Amino acid sequence: MITITIVYFTNKIQHVKKIKLNIGTPVHEALKILQINIKKNNKIGIYGELVSLNHILNNKDRLEIYRPLKINPRELRKQKINRKLK
């Protein structure tokens, strides 16, 4: 058995869950077990590195589900600069 941590957000709430899985469990199985439905535009990572849904999880992995950005960081900087100039 392996133990992993899954981190994801719903609205403005961060969820952190630890679960035990069988050795050789892929990401998509872990999500199915936790009944987490991800959208097509969500990315999945382990410790900040993107992985596929078929990636095999290892003991003590931190599985992260990333939300899509609401605004491009470059556009956000432009908006902040424009506000300061006014």
Curated annotation (Swiss-Prot):
<dbReference type="InterPro" id="IPR005346">
    <property type="entry name" value="RnfH"/>
</dbReference>
<dbReference type="InterPro" id="IPR016155">
    <property type="entry name" value="Mopterin_synth/thiamin_S_b"/>
</dbReference>
<comment type="similarity">
    <text>Belongs to the UPF0125 (RnfH) family.</text>
</comment>
<dbReference type="InterPro" id="IPR037021">
    <property type="entry name" value="RnfH_sf"/>
</dbReference>
<dbReference type="Pfam" id="PF03658">
    <property type="entry name" value="Ub-RnfH"/>
</dbReference>
<protein>
    <recommendedName>
        <fullName>UPF0125 protein bbp_234</fullName>
    </recommendedName>
</protein>
